[in-house]
Design a protein with these regions (language model features):
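Cytoplasmic C-terminal tails of single-pass
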Residues: 437-442
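Metal-dependent polysaccharide deacetylase catalytic core of the NodB/CE4 family, i.e.
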Residues: 33-38, 176-292, 320, 353
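Alpha-helical transmembrane segments
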Residues: 422-436
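A glycine-centered loop/beta-turn motif at secondary-structure junctions
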Residues: 29-33, 76-88, 97-151
Length: 442
């Protein structure tokens, strides 16, 4: 009897100890999505089909392994959690390759030209509607993230320190009054950080955050596109730390899609888990035997509002951009159009991830917005007068954090108490069986 009880107790204790590790492992293991291609575009066409497929595949949250038709192996097919084939040219894949690929049809999606009679997704990248239909097929087959809602986000894009900041404030008020959450893609600043223009700029960004906005670091203006990765990281580190000093807390990064294909941008991209991808119409040739792109928690493909000529049901993981220097009347007209279409903009505060440039780590999660593990408030507007009049706002924020009940700790204790109760119940149950057996065999 004692041995049985001991086994049950050991089993439950083991579950309690191992379960968090299993959950953490499941969260961190993004899995690999293998993309096999013949050419990056169709012959005689200008559209970079491969670039579209890669960006869409990144929205699944998986790591991307890119291989051309001559470089992949059977082992690659077996190891991949999912396989996308992009065939821009007829006959590029040998029949033996086609047969091997379709043996794994449960994890295969074929896009483009195919000599077999199997199901394929047709090539039609000129039509944005078709593009998002294909995007949904990729997500339906390969996206195993917990959150698979159709999230679309409004972005006030390309906001600069020299813009009309009163206009930005007016737009933030309009969105707040209409219950529309939004993102501000704010240009990174790494020079002249003490200028009054910088103080006015960050004050306007703090106001946007207090009106339901979330800040994303925009790409810094670069005089030299050949800048080294170390120097680029250094500039973004200065920009992030400067924003934090001004009580502005960006949670992600806007990038040029060119960076996805540059080996000297790998470390740069590893400093963020949330990206908004700008489209580079002059991207050029993509031609790799092998290339690896790490997965991100949140990938938003930016489109302009003028492209919205189709059902809102197709909008998943998109950032609908309106440039920051648009007039208020034009801005309002576009918002009214989106409302008429029926777009229900998602709250960007739910984008969980981190930004780790510089000496500070910004983390956005269900616990709230945190810098180096300390909760900060982006909901309360702090004017420049308040910012420079108060000497210790950080201490005030930390004291506020102390008064916040941490529900995660409470939930953990509830879980432990529940498991303990189950263990006690099992012990009494086994003991009662023991007593009943004694009575029965008297």
């Amino acid at each position: 009897m004692f041995n049985n009880i001991k086994k049950v107790v050991v089993l439950f204790i083991s579950i309690i100890i191992i379960l968090p590790s299993i959950m953490a492992l499941g969260t961190e293991n993004k899995g690999n999505l293998l993309i096999i291609y013949d050419e990056y575009k169709e012959y005689g066409e200008d559209i970079n089909n491969l670039n579209y497929v890669i960006k869409i595949a990144l929205t699944t949250g998986k790591n991307i392994e890119l291989k051309n038709v001559d470089s992949y192996t059977i082992e690659d097919l077996n190891k991949a959690q999912g396989i996308i084939v992009l065939s821009n040219e007829e006959g590029a894949f040998k029949q033996s390759q086609v047969d091997d690929l379709y043996k794994r049809s449960e994890k295969l999606l074929w896009i483009g030209k195919n000599s077999s009679n199997e199901d394929v997704v047709p090539l039609n990248f000129k039509d944005k509607k078709h593009l998002f239909e294909m995007k949904n097929k990729i997500n339906d087959k390969f996206n195993n993230k917990n959150n698979r809602e159709k999230n679309s986000y409004l972005v006030i894009d390309e906001v600069y320190p020299y813009d009309d900041l009163n206009l930005l404030v007016k737009k933030a008020d309009y969105l707040y009054d209409n219950g529309i959450p939004f993102i501000v893609s704010a240009m990174s600043v790494y020079e002249n950080l003490e200028f009054d223009a910088m103080k006015r700029y960050t004050e306007a960004l703090r106001y946007c955050a207090s009106r339901g906005g979330i800040i994303i670091l925009g790409e810094p203006y670069l005089y030299d596109n050949g800048i080294s990765e170390d120097e680029l990281i250094q500039r973004l580190s200065i920009a992030q730390d400067a924003f934090i000093n001004y009580k502005v807390y960006p949670i992600g990064l806007t990038i040029n899609d060119e960076y996805l294909y540059r080996n000297d941008r790998f470390n740069y991209l590893s400093n963020t888990s949330t990206i908004i991808i700008n489209e580079n119409e002059n991207l050029g040739v993509i031609d790799f035997e092998n290339h690896y792109i790490p997965g991100f928690n949140n990938v938003l493909i930016k489109i302009q509002g003028e492209d919205l000529n189709f059902s809102e049901d197709l909008l998943t993981d998109v950032a609908i951009g309106i440039k920051g220097n648009e007039s208020f009347d034009t801005f309002k007209e576009k918002i009214d159009l989106y409302k008429k279409i029926g777009i229900d903009f998602s709250n960007p505060r739910n984008l969980e991830g981190e930004l780790t440039f510089g000496d500070n780590k910004i983390n956005n999660s269900r616990k709230g917005l945190m810098v180096n593990g300390v909760k900060v408030s982006g909901n309360k507007f702090i004017s420049n007068e308040e910012l420079y009049g108060e000497k210790d706002l950080d201490q005030e924020e930390q004291e506020t954090e102390k008064n916040v009940v941490d529900l995660t700790k409470a939930n953990r204790w509830i879980f432990i108490i529940t498991i303990t109760g189950v263990i006690v119940f099992v012990i009494f149950l086994l003991y009662s069986f023991r007593i009943d057996r004694k009575k029965y065999f008297k």
